[in-house]
């Protein structure tokens, strides 16, 4: 009788341990799959595409080591060609989007505040196109470094309409699992290298500060609103900004191009 009671106690203890182990396993599984977002600012000015490629490689290794991939990518660009558009513009339907000789499969980012018929994307002969280089110049790098990502959102923002940053950041924050957010942004335009470098130092300094959202609109960049989305996301998690490189068309060719100069910063947050 005593042995039978001991066996019952032993089996009960074993059952408790097994249940606890399973609970702990699922708890850690949920933790490892909780919502995460990874933030980067990458130029679309391709005077030196090798450096852009190197930065994508750097981000892949830093954010997604081994064979990991993000579950989705959100690519934010200034709306270069439809400057009167006050709404964020995205896709109407899923499909393969073409820019020059590059294509990418993309998905609509569903929100009533997003327009999809403003001209950033257009259909011709059954093919959806974009001519906006802020989006299209990144297609080849996304395909190269994140080839198995099935969900890519393409959004063109009215450059200085900062009111979109908060709600976009909130929506992105709700996306499941791992999200890579790329703000496609070029920095100083049409200035001598000395002035451009000064402006870029100011921009980086502002991005480093907390509570500086209202200052973003005045920065010498082509999409303050894109930076605003990343800034809002970073502020929620207190994620710091880091600079990988800063260059310009002047530093690349080795002479001051003056009013033909465009500068770039390669930034990430963690």
Where are these regions (language model features)?
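Short, Lys/Arg-rich N-terminal segment immediately upstream of the first membrane anchor
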Residues: 1-8
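Flexible, D/E/H-enriched segments
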Residues: 10-71, 80-177, 191-270
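Conserved beta-strand elements of the Class I
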Residues: 71-74, 180-182
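Divalent metal-coordination and catalytic microenvironments
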Residues: 76, 142, 186
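Short acidic/histidine-rich active-site segments
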Residues: 180-191
């Amino acid at each position: 009788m005593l042995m039978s009671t001991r066996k019952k106690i032993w089996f009960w203890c074993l059952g408790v341990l097994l249940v606890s182990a399973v609970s702990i396993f699922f708890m850690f599984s949920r933790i490892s799959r909780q919502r995460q977002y990874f933030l980067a600012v990458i130029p679309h000015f391709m005077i030196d595409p090798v450096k852009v490629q190197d930065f994508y490689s750097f981000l892949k290794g830093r954010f997604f080591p081994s064979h990991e991939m993000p579950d989705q990518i959100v690519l934010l660009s200034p709306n270069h060609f439809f400057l009167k558009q006050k709404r964020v513009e995205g896709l109407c339907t899923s499909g393969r989007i073409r820019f020059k000789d590059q294509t990418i499969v993309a998905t609509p980012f569903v929100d009533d505040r997003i327009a999809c018929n403003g001209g950033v994307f257009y259909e011709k002969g059954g093919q959806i196109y974009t001519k906006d280089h802020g989006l299209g110049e990144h297609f080849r790098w996304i395909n190269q470094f994140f080839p198995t990502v099935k969900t890519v959102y393409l959004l063109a923002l009215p450059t200085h309409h900062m009111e979109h940053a908060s709600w976009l950041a909130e929506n992105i924050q709700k996306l499941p699992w791992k999200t890579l957010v790329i703000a496609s942004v070029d920095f100083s335009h049409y200035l001598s290298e000395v002035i451009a470098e000064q402006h870029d130092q100011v921009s980086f300094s502002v991005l480093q500060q907390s509570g500086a959202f209202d200052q973003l609109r005045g920065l010498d960049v082509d999409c303050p609103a894109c930076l605003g989305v990343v800034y809002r996301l970073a502020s929620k998690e207190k994620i710091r900004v880091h600079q990988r490189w800063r260059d310009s068309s002047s530093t690349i060719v080795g002479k001051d191009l003056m009013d033909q100069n465009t500068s770039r910063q390669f930034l990430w947050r963690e």
